[in-house]
Amino acid sequence: MCIRDRNNTSLIEQKVSEKLKSETSNLNIIIKNPFFANTEDILKADGLLIGTTENLASMAGATKDFFDRNYYNVIEKKEGMPVAVWIRAGHDGTGTTIQMKSIIKGLKWRLVQEILICKGPWQKKFIDQCINLSLGFAIGLESNIY
């Protein structure tokens, strides 16, 4: 999972991580701040779960930096890799959704679940929504569905 530290976003990451580690036994769950995730991490991954915030109708700068640094190093090397995405958007998440879909398409990765957009003022239900998306993704990987 690639995620940037922020108070509520960090809370989501913590709860998702705890749930994944307690509910999956055959997966090696690695969580990295996007500034520290690198090409080797992507090449070793069987799937990628991306959590990002939306800032000014665009994906967080940390997430953009992650793709800028790694895009050309992994293009054509991880075609078909399953991906799931959640976006914490104060407004509507449209800009980040468009960007994420474009990048995923360019890398020829597979978006295996609809992008989850947690929009509007912070709500505790965002945690459960992100857990459900993440757990479904992890179970799909663990079961070789993807």
Question: Which residue stretches match the model-derived regions?
Answer:
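Short helix-loop-beta junction
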Residues: 14-26, 105-110
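Glycine-rich phosphate/pyrophosphate-binding loop and the adjoining helix
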Residues: 23, 38, 110-146
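A short beta-strand-loop structural module common to alpha/beta enzyme folds
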Residues: 25-36
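Short histidine/acidic/glycine/proline-rich micro-motifs that form metal-
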Residues: 6-7, 56, 87-92, 117-123
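Helix-loop-strand module that forms the ligand-binding subsite of alpha/beta enzymes
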Residues: 34-111
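Alpha-helical elements of Rossmann-like donor-binding domains used by nucleotide-donor carbohydrate transfer enzymes
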Residues: 15, 65, 99, 129-136
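Short, small-residue-biased leader/transition segments that mark boundaries at the very start
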Residues: 1-3
